[in-house]
Amino acid sequence: MSEGIFTLDAEVRTDLGKGASRRLRHEDKVPAVLYGLGKEAVSLTLSHNKVFQAQEFEAFYSHVLTLNVDGKKVEAVIKDMQRHPFKPRVTHLDFLRVDAKQALQTNVPLHFVNEDKAESIKTHGGHAEHHMVDVEISCLPADLPEFIEVDVTNVELGQTLHLSDIALPEGVTSVELAKGEDHDLAVVTVKTAKGPSVESEEDDAEGEEAAAE
């Protein structure tokens, strides 16, 4: 993975509105907005090809990016990305400015690991049901992780891991947990595999009896 995906060239745009955004997309460009840190929001234009290549990497969504805005470097993270409903196109981006000395809030992906080693799954036939695929965290830009691992090794059948069970990197806190115990959301549950229904078992038995006759 090239570090180049974390640097994007952008231009300030003054031609705003739906019509202007539509024209930009026809020119293979992506409209965007940059905001945050108490500064005025700025409308931007970026190369669609560069954005599309970068967004194929998971780390692009949970990494501090460098925007070269008309020659000036700005540190930011992706806050929102809109896509075309059926075409492989990015239609709009939201960037949030970051300051090295100020904590930021953003979502990072969860990586569920060791499901193949969990006895509840490997031996007892359970399956892991993921209740979320990412988690909102708060941290300084330097502490921003690309992802957070959720270790399923010791999760038993019927057991659920919650946010409070997840080991977060040093300097990283859960935004939801900071709101109180009521926000200790479920992350993953190992559920018992569903067996055949009683009706299907009875049908099988009747079929076997009929075959025997």
Curated annotation (Swiss-Prot):
InterPro entries: Rbsml_bL25/Gln-tRNA_synth_N, Ribosomal_bL25/Gln-tRNA_synth, Ribosomal_bL25_b-dom, Ribosomal_bL25_C, Ribosomal_bL25_long, Ribosomal_bL25_short, Ribosomal_L25_dom, Ribosomal_uL5_bac-type
UniProt superkingdom: Bacteria
Record carries keyword Ribosomal protein: yes
Bias kind Acidic residues: ranges: 199-213
Listed GO MF terms: 5S rRNA binding; structural constituent of ribosome
Record flagged with keyword Isomerase: no
CDD domains: Ribosomal_L25_TL5_CTC (cd00495)
GO cellular component: cytosolic large ribosomal subunit
GO biological process terms on file: translation
Family of this protein: Belongs to the bacterial ribosomal protein bL25 family. CTC subfamily.
Protein name, UniProt field: Large ribosomal subunit protein bL25
Organism: Pseudoalteromonas atlantica (strain T6c / ATCC BAA-1087)
